[in-house]
Amino acid sequence: MHKFICTWGAILALGVTFPAAAHDRARTPVRVPDLPGFVTLKCDFHTHTVFSDGKVWPDIRAEEAWREGLDAIAITDHIEHQPHKNDLPTAHNRSYEIARGHGEALQLLVIPGSEITRSMPPGHLNAIFLQDARKLDVPDWREAVAEARRQGAFIFYNHPGWRGQQPDGRARWYPEHDELLAKDQLHGVEVVNEREYYPEAHAWCLEKNLTMLSNSDIHNPIGLDYDLHLGDRRPLTLAFARERSRQAIREALFARRTVVLAGNRLVGREEHVRPLFERSLRILTPQVRIRGTGRAYVQIHNESDIPYQLRITGSDPDLAFPQELRLPAGRVALLEVRGRGKDREGRRMVQVSCQVTNVLVRPETPLAATLEFEVTLSPQP
């Protein structure tokens, strides 16, 4: 018994060998292809800390993002809403300063920002790439926005369908937003905030030439809102930048080179989502052979972390395809192709028309795409 106790005590002393005692500080990359001439940066431009109504210290925001595979975050604590002011002094720049220090150690880009928090209209606006957030702490919301623009900020309309200001959950555009747009004081809209997708905001971005954004608006520790260990992920803005830098992200935002990645859905302009989809896939068997009414399998490798759901819309006089095809993230899927006749022969290229149902180029409008491969048909003996 004494020997057992001693042995067990020695094991406990080396508790690092137990999985429950181990805690890896490790990064999980988000695999998304780059576009020609650009690097795809994974960003979250709406986060909060204890310096407004968030629940975590600013450096935690930086490490959370680094662990999740992000390239950049903006710290956007509220200007007007300071529920912790009895415990922490109001210091509008301090959360960014703290987060940036840890971000630099992790090679994570941290961007200074603030949330201008007013009643509707105009509602809540994020201003990022600020020089001094303290100057936005003024009574008149118009002056706060004007000051942000004088500092060179990129300004966007937050959660336009948030039920705290829109009880029916419907996003609305007001004359005040037209006013800001005319003054070059509004540049984008959150098409997704947390887990909410706003189709109205998606349409505004196309109609009014605004940048599409997708952000977490995180207040809690990230693990309380997202089941990271199950593959759950915060919403991200994919920014197509010329290089990995704050200035390049700013340029990409003003140029509207973004795509929304939220859950398993992509939302964006066709010029961006099409190459993103196409560069995610690699056909491993570009040539197949079919005898008569036999079958062949086209192997398609989805090299990204974005699963795709395809609805086959095209038809072929010689070949039959399934109605739907799923391309799981990081895996190889099979497209089954069957011959329609026993006596068909020849070799030709086949283009299978489809809709990528979880990639939206407009509200309720999926991306139209094609899968291409070569087939050789021979008669059935």
What are these regions (language model features)?
Residues 26-154, 158, 166-167, 184, ...:
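A metal-dependent hydrolase metal-coordination microenvironment
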Residues 2-5, 141:
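Structural motif marking the loop-to-transmembrane transition
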